[in-house]
């Protein structure tokens, strides 16, 4: 599992590559939380386009980050165009509460739109 983070407009961008499972989810969670909380980010975009596998631990990881971001009055968005991962997200019910976008650029534009309109 590979994790890359960057900051853009007060949003933490988290790019995950490889397999997100019970072996990797705890260390990934700690890295994401330390970066998000330690740098006073408001929003988060999780880019899952390069994930090759995700189990229920990955769903739990995303759900926990969603709660954290919402508690800080931020927005969490997911970027994913991988059909297998999208199906997992849909079956878990996450897509009922978290918006999904096909590209990082579109997700970042949506955050700017929300920020500019206060919604």
PLM feature segments, named:
Residues 84, 103-106:
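Residue-level recognition of oxygen-bearing side chains
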